[in-house]
Amino acid sequence: MDSIETHAKQLGRQTPLPASPEEAQLDRVPNPHADTDYLARFTVPEFTSLCPVTGQPDFATLVIDYVPDRWLVESKSLKLYLAAFRNHGAFHEDCTVGIGRRLADLLEPRWLRIGGYWYPRGGIPIDVFWQTGEPLKSVWLPDQGVAPYRGRG
């Protein structure tokens, strides 16, 4: 199996924030349990991007679940990739689905889903969900744990 250092180019180094998601480098590392079906979850409670029309900030909680195959996403590179969206203008759907697709292309997981729970803009919350296919029956798949937006009261 390859060493982690072969694949994790940013780990253990001072790494500047990428200027854009397109410029961000996502790293993957070998999965030491590739023979086992299990779920890995990343919860991102303070995701930000910009409205592509007004330039105003948008906020979301992202929940990324995946059943890895040969590869795991290296978490520092994921953090830097997601942080690069804070000055990136895109609609909620584009951010959410684009992140899911980029991770799926990189990792080639057995299964992946992303839930984007966006705070209201113009009085309307937008929740966006994307997945690669049917979830595996052999894996415990907990609820994403983000309640629907109810406003105040």
From Swiss-Prot:
Molecular-function annotations in GO: preQ1 synthase activity
The EC number(s) this enzyme carries: 1.7.1.13
UniProt-annotated catalytic positions: 51 (thioimide intermediate), 58 (proton donor)
Residues the record lists as binding substrate: 73-75, 92-93
Residues covered by region (Disordered): 1-30
UniProt cross-references to HAMAP family, sorted A to Z: QueF_type1
SUPFAM superfamilies: Tetrahydrobiopterin biosynthesis enzymes-like
Function per UniProt: Catalyzes the NADPH-dependent reduction of 7-cyano-7-deazaguanine (preQ0) to 7-aminomethyl-7-deazaguanine (preQ1).
Keywords assigned: Cytoplasm, NADP, Oxidoreductase, Queuosine biosynthesis
Family annotation (PANTHER family): NADPH-DEPENDENT 7-CYANO-7-DEAZAGUANINE REDUCTASE (PTHR34354:SF1)
Protein name: NADPH-dependent 7-cyano-7-deazaguanine reductase
Superkingdom of the organism of origin: Bacteria
UniProt cross-references to Pfam families, sorted A to Z: QueF (PF14489)
